[in-house]
């Protein structure tokens, strides 16, 4: 069918401010994938989309996005093994714009972007070009 499910996870602002981000992500990944066998998990993408960044114009700092995406990959490795974890694309979503996307894509565990409102802008092509610079198809 060519469809690729995207499983979105992310914390609220109060959870981030209280230092709960990583435990929230651990729980969301564990509970959200419960019952899925490894071959199915390999076929999905997971997007780290902090709730506080959705449509607000706020974006996670590159190190925050890396920390979250790395934790998601670690949790996948704990649950399914390193091979499966390496096959899952982990995306960042949350107020992506041409001016912040390259710094996010430069992080080793950010495999791409989940683009919302920016996909309706003329500058969307710039986002695609940036992504391809870091992760050629």
Q: Can you describe what each PLM-predicted range is?
A:
Residues 1-137:
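Active-site loop-to-helix "anion-binding N-cap" substructures in soluble metabolic enzymes
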């Amino acid at each position: 069918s060519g469809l690729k499910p995207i499983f979105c996870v992310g914390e609220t602002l109060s959870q981030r401010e209280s230092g709960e981000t990583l435990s929230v992500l651990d729980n969301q990944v564990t509970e959200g994938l419960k019952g899925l066998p490894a071959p199915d998990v390999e076929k999905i993408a997971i997007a780290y989309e902090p709730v506080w960044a959705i449509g607000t114009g706020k974006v996670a700092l590159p190190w925050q996005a890396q920390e979250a995406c790395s934790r998601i990959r670690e949790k996948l490795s704990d649950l399914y093994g390193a091979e499966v974890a390496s096959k899952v694309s982990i995306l960042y979503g949350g107020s992506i714009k041409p001016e912040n996307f390259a710094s996010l894509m430069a992080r080793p565990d950010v495999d791409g972007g989940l683009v919302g409102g920016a996909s309706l802008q003329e500058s969307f092509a710039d986002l695609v070009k940036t992504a391809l610079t870091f992760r050629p198809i």
